[in-house]
Amino acid sequence: MNITSTKIKNFRLLSDVELALEKETTVIVGRNNSGKTSLTEVIRRFLGNDSPSFQLEDFSINCYEKFFKLFQRILADEEKIEAPLDESSEIEFRDDLPAIELCLTIEYDKSLPNFGALSPFIIDLNDDCTKTNIIIRYGLEYGKINEFFLNEIDLENKILFSQELKKRISKFFTTKVWAQDPNDLSNKKELTLKDVKKLIQVDFINAQRGLDDVTTKESNPLARLLEGFFDTTSMSKEAQDQSTIQKLEDAVTSVQTSINQGFSEQLKDLFPSLKKFGYPGLGTQSFQTEVILDVKKLLSNFTHVYYPNSGVNLPESYNGLGTRNLILILLQLAKFHKEYSTKNDGMNIHLIFIEEPEAHLHPQMQEVFIKQLEEATEMLANTGTPWIPQFVISTHSSHISNAVGFKHIRYFLQNNQQKTIIKDLKKDFSDYDNNKTFIHKYMTLTKSDLFLLTKLF
């Protein structure tokens, strides 16, 4: 099973867009401020948090005027102010009230012996249907329409109106989830975010990976990944993983015992000094110390990655940024795979966002990045639980875009109304199959790619 498309409404530049996803890799291309980060962020908000929250500023710009006009429309009618809105009025106004919405279309194989975590989302009665919709919406809580609209609000001053609206959105808006029959949009079933997260695991490799400045607190991101590996491996039920964890804990216990023995001996030497101050006195017990070591804290706080070089271990920050970037991406993928294998049986969806993987990579490495990513994924998938992640990669690299071809590229454009338009090159060039090779060559313009060849100079 896999996600075939995502529809997003009213989130920042993504006022009303649909993004088709490939089964394996989709590449997002576009200028700065074209909505690429907004895509990642709305997925992170809904599927990466236990309790999604949004602010007025997260709504698309055109929503501000919709809010204002709706308040004008309701408050202009004095009868509505004096009498609470009934159920039919709530339905009428709710349809016009802006809400941030994410719709995921899932495609599945109907011949599967069981649908696992997908089962609650399949609500149609059509034996030939192999799709279902999952809708997650951040909107006005049901039953709160009177409190949201009928309390006093200043419509004369737009600044004061926005300030009050911001408070009301925070107070009265909430997240709802439901499954929807793609053949009958009125057929719905309310579910929870917990149901969605059982089905879909979402992970992110952010653009800012803390590699650039050795003076920052983020100077050893590779070492910090070890803590994540330990946490994930600890939850694994596989015998090999449990054996590894036990060996780590045994090693730490051995060190802990040795330290405690040394501390006890040194403590005895302090007793004469303490006795001068009357300790321990009558009715006062003596004391002893015990050192307790935590494997997790040792890995996160006291473990550092070094690179052997001519007998000297160089710290992590001494390696090139491009190399560290690749290592970090690969280690994070391995961590995501371990988490997926621990929590799932291979019947779930794994969506992984990678932002700007080209950072610090030379053109040749950018050109082969997608291919290497696929090979690394295949290698990890062969280690146990079936694993077919869906990658969404946002990039400014023409080399990465050129390597994947039109089928995988979605181009983000911002129009004059400050809205994002998504150009699906797979669809746009579907009528030009015979000329696709020529068009691809025409759009490929590279120069000086030989400069970084190892033996050129």
Question: What would you call each of these model-derived segments?
Answer:
Residues G48-L85, H337-M347, M379-I388, N415-Q418, ...:
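Flexible phosphate/Mg2+-sensing switch loops adjacent to catalytic phosphate-binding sites
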Residues M1-G48, Q55-A76:
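Pre-Walker A-like glycine/lysine-rich segment at the N-terminus of P-loop NTPase domains
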Residues D58-A239, S243-Q246, D431:
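Glycine-rich phosphate-binding loops of NTPases
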Residues V368-F369, L373:
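Conserved hydrophobic alpha-helix in the ABC-type ATPase nucleotide-binding domain
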Residues V29-G30, S317, E356, H396:
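The Walker A (P-loop) glycine that initiates the GxxxxGKT/S ATP-binding motif of P-loop NTPases
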Residues P389, T395-S397:
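Conserved H-loop
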Residues A381-G384, H399-F457:
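RecA-like P-loop NTPase motor core
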